[in-house]
């Protein structure tokens, strides 16, 4: 399972990516429906914030829902010393909920993923490439909250990964590799190539 993490620990590899726009046409034509994107809220993630994300997503994707019952953040994924949760652990649990739909977990807690710099390296989001499963946090590792605009872009980035997109070389695309930084201010949309790939997956990006 190839896992992509967003910002502060973004490690996707283009050699492992699905080629953009190369899905056989006969496969595309067989798709009668697209998966619903289900937003799962952890603990006290604000309903108003979830609704904002859902409305933004509905502008580019035809089937979006917010699950009514919140999920509980598992204690076994909590790191007390750093006061943050394992993003990879949450991702593994979310995969079990997929059942044919796309799943995105939403949390207000800081999440982490081990890398060469730290076993509890803070990240903004994590997804499993091409499996339609991901999780994002509205709280940065610094403890500051994302603006609504940046949170929407983070959501689009992780969903792009989960639908099969790897990082993009276009510095103004949602899918650009943040390289341990924050490039949201320079990414207004998906580039034409990434947009075409997602539209072949059922998205409605104009």
Question: Could you tell me what each predicted segment is?
Answer:
Residues 6-9:
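C-terminal motif of bacterial Sec signal peptides marking the signal peptidase cleavage site
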Residues 11-13:
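Bacterial signal peptide processing site
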Residues 18-33:
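Acidic, contiguous N-terminal accessory segments
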Residues 27-29, 43, 120-150, 166-206:
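Metalloprotease/metallohydrolase-associated module, dominated by Zn2+-dependent proteases
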Residues 33-46:
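Fold-level signature of zinc-dependent metallopeptidase catalytic domains
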Residues 47-154, 166:
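Metzincin-family zinc-dependent endopeptidase catalytic domain
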Residues 154-162:
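Catalytic glutamate of the conserved HExxH
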């Amino acid at each position: 399972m190839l896992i992509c993490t967003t910002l502060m620990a973004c490690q996707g590899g283009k050699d492992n990516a699905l080629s953009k726009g190369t899905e056989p046409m006969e496969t595309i034509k067989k798709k009668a429906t697209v998966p619903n994107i289900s937003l799962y809220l952890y603990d006290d993630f604000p309903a108003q914030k979830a609704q904002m994300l859902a409305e933004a997503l509905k502008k580019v994707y035809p089937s979006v829902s917010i699950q009514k019952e919140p999920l509980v953040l598992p204690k076994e994924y909590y790191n007390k010393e750093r006061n943050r949760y394992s993003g990879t652990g949450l991702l593994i649990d979310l995969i079990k909920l997929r059942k044919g739909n796309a799943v995105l977990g939403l949390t207000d807690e800081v999440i982490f993923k081990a890398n060469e710099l730290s076993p509890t390296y803070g990240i903004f989001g994590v997804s499993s490439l091409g499996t339609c499963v991901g999780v994002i946090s509205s709280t940065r590792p610094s403890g500051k909250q994302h603006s609504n605009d940046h949170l929407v872009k983070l959501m689009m980035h992780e969903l792009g990964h989960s639908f099969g997109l790897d990082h993009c070389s276009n510095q103004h695309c949602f899918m650009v590799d943040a390289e341990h930084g924050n490039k949201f201010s320079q990414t207004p949309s998906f580039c034409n190539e990434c947009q075409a790939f997602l539209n072949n997956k059922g998205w409605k990006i104009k």
